[in-house]
From Swiss-Prot:
One of its GO terms (cellular component) is nucleoplasm. GO terms for biological process: cellular response to glucose starvation; CMP catabolic process; dCMP catabolic process; dTMP catabolic process; dUMP catabolic process; nucleobase-containing compound metabolic process; UMP catabolic process; UMP salvage. NCBIfam families: euk_UDPppase. Pathway: Pyrimidine metabolism; UMP biosynthesis via salvage pathway; uracil from uridine (phosphorylase route): step 1/1. Belongs to the PNP/UDP phosphorylase family. One of its GO terms (molecular function) is thymidine phosphorylase activity. Uridine binds at S142, G143, Q217, G218, R219. Its EC number is 2.4.2.3. Phosphate binds at G60, R94, R138, I139, G140, T141. Keywords: Glycosyltransferase, Transferase. It comes from Homo sapiens (Human). Homodimer. It catalyses: uridine + phosphate = alpha-D-ribose 1-phosphate + uracil; 2'-deoxyuridine + phosphate = 2-deoxy-alpha-D-ribose 1-phosphate + uracil. This is Uridine phosphorylase 1.
Length: 310
């Protein structure tokens, strides 16, 4: 039965934490259609399909998340030459989902609306599968502030464009604000894993989540621009002073929803450019491809390390 009451809004931070839903209406439903996943509780046995899941990694594109499942499969010794990973969400072109062992890999598209839809259905999937002790990590790309391209940022706090650690949504015409808490212990574990790998620079910092790639992030090269270069530089410098080290478009709702539903969550993104020095991503494709593999390698190593201690 779904969690209800005022206390349900506060996710506990301990090691034995079931996935919870903050919606009493779910308990009244005879069938739940996860439309964007092409899965339904009447046709699919969620505990049999997903009950062993302990780690979920989400990222923007289907191809990147398929590459990740291959990466983690190899790291865990579960991959073999020629093995294919079928898309569990075949039949819909909205999201892609792959699984190997206790690891689920899901694409979420770009921006808050797209990842929000995915998270609603993903969290319900984990709930119906009776999963517990689930760690969920967003891996992706971002624009850095004051960092060399290729630097990996582990998010300490997801902040909005006013540098506040909260996610605001309009629900039935009213403002609803949720905290964007991330698991501090998980941040330190990931940072230690990066030090053990010793392959690339990794820092901990705040991540600013915006509603747009162009004006929302202070770019000067969009179809619209209502500010000067001086305005842009002043804003980015203020962000840096507030502890922001990278910018993307998903972390705030990701942190808010995962925290509320009892999921240990982290965000690990590589920076593709230093926004204090420009707006356009101009590195060669092969360089960008290697950058994008860095969060995958770090998180794969982390998962292997955690499973070896289980």
């Amino acid at each position: 039965m779904a969690a209800t009451g005022a206390n349900a809004e506060k996710a506990e931070s301990h090691n034995d934490c079931p996935v919870r839903l903050l919606n009493p209406n779910i308990a009244k439903m005879k069938e739940d259609i996860l439309y964007h996943f092409n899965l339904t509780t009447s046709r699919h046995n969620f505990p049999a399909l997903f009950g062993d899941v302990k780690f979920v990694c989400v990222g923007g594109s289907p191809s990147r998340m398929k590459a990740f499942i291959r990466c983690v499969g190899a790291e865990l010794g579960l991959d073999c030459p020629g093995r294919d990973y079928p898309n569990i969400c075949a039949g819909t072109d909205r999201y892609a989902m792959y699984k190997v062992g206790p690891v689920l890999s899901v694409s979420h598209g770009m921006g808050i609306p797209s990842i929000s839809i995915m998270l609603h259905e993903l969290i319900k999937l984990l709930y119906y599968a009776r999963c517990s002790n689930v760690t969920i990590i967003r891996i992706g790309t971002s624009g850095g502030i004051g960092l060399e391209p290729g630097t990996v940022v582990i998010t300490e706090q997801a902040v909005d464009t006013c540098f506040k650690a909260e996610f605001e949504q309009i629900v039935l015409g009213k403002r609803v604000i949720r905290k964007t808490d991330l698991n501090k212990k998980l941040v330190q574990e990931l940072l230690l894993c990066s030090a053990e790998l010793s392959e690339f620079t990794t820092v901990v910092g705040n991540t600013m989540c915006t509603l747009d790639f162009y004006e929302g992030q202070g770019r000067l090269d969009g179809a619209l621009c209502s500010y000067t270069e001086k305005d842009k530089q002043a804003y980015l410098e203020a962000a840096y002073a507030a502890g922001v080290r990278n910018i993307e478009m998903e972390s705030s709702v990701f942190a808010a929803m995962c925290s509320a539903c009892g999921l240990q969550a982290a965000v690990v993104c590589v920076t593709l450019l230093n926004r204090l020095e420009g707006d356009q991503i101009s590195s060669p494709r092969n360089v960008l491809s290697e950058y994008q593999q860095r969060p995958q390698r770090l998180v794969s190593y982390f998962i292997k390390k955690k499973l070896s201690k289980a």
